[in-house]
Amino acid sequence: MKRESSTQLRAGFTTGTCAAAAAKGAALMLRDQCLCDQVTLRLPTGISATFRLEGQEFSSSSASCFVVKDAGDDPDITNGAELHARVTVPPPLPLAQGDMVEITGGTGIGRATKPGLAVAPGEWAINPVPRRMIQEAVGEVFADRRVLVQISIPDGELRAQKTLNARLGILGGLSILGTTGIVRPISAKAWTDTIDTALDVARACGCATVVFSTGRTSELAAQEWLKVRGARFDFGDQESGNADREPGTMYLEPLPEEAFVMMGDHVAHALRSARERGFHQPVIACQYAKLVKIACGYENTHAAASDMDLARLRAWAVEAELPSRVVETIASANTAREIAVSTGFDPALLTLTARKALQASQGHATGAHPLFVVADYGGRIVFHSLPAENNA
């Protein structure tokens, strides 16, 4: 995959693709009893790609090699990781599965510990599509023999510390991921996939609601604030998995770690995904600038995808007859942060902005009724729109 121009970004390959390529290379060396420098692999999209093999070793009973992951121009924590595969035949122990190709994890591969993931608790975090890719790649070489394939990433546990794996319930290393086999550069899909997975875990763990955050500062502030204050949420509905609770009733319940989901700038996707999973009243923790962008109706609040429309904010303030000092501050300010700080996080202004944000959110996801928690720039909660039962 060569760069075609100075502006075109280069795609890369998923961990699943690299693991399958390494497994095929090891299988070929084991069968042919000679070194193999590269392999060609057919991806789920139907295209083929060729991969260079490194660290090749083989004996009469096993072979191993690795592929260095190239994520292209995608800022991926797994870029440069070594995806190792060892193929053994006959397997040292009877295979636990009925498949001709059994796949296990080794060093640096995580295990699932929570429900709601693509693999069951206790299983190696090798997702279904990569698993199938490995089985098919090795099956091409050993069509009628049972073999054991072990996938490992030497520094996988260290790399995993920079991911959300632990929060999602994947411990001990990285996940082997991918659906198309290709990593699209600077794509939002990796982030939105993580949001979806986190919501699946939250639902499977029985969370009453979820708390989205736009950044780590607002998330930490919300976690601490909710832990100290406690919170009541209207989550009595059939879809949420709490059918024994009456709709419209407020319940006091602590929120577990799984309830906190980092959505970043992907507000519309997060709201729709939450609604699809029965979370109709999520909490959104953010700073004031993000609240303004949510109120303006942007699906994505990143600076590259949204403008800070202070003129609209001023029009809302005038229409709501907010104090003249607030209106004047908005008119003269250059940033939402300046407005928030200069007005002392004026309660009427924040209430107005949260109301507009609620209306905009319902445009993204019909039936959604998010609650808002706003943190100042020192990590302290200065506003919330939680129900009256929470006003201690």
Curated annotation (Swiss-Prot):
Pfam families associated with the record: CbiD (PF01888)
InterPro entries hit by this protein: CbiD (IPR002748), CbiD_sf (IPR036074)
Keywords: Cobalamin biosynthesis, Methyltransferase, S-adenosyl-L-methionine, Transferase
Record has Transferase as a keyword: yes
The reaction(s) this protein catalyses: Co-precorrin-5B + S-adenosyl-L-methionine = Co-precorrin-6A + S-adenosyl-L-homocysteine
GO biological process: anaerobic cobalamin biosynthetic process; methylation
Disulfide linkage: none
Lineage: superkingdom: Bacteria
HAMAP family xrefs: CbiD
Family (UniProt): Belongs to the CbiD family.
PANTHER family associated with the record: COBALT-PRECORRIN-5B C(1)-METHYLTRANSFERASE
Protein name listed in UniProt: Cobalt-precorrin-5B C(1)-methyltransferase
Organism: Pelobacter propionicus (strain DSM 2379 / NBRC 103807 / OttBd1)
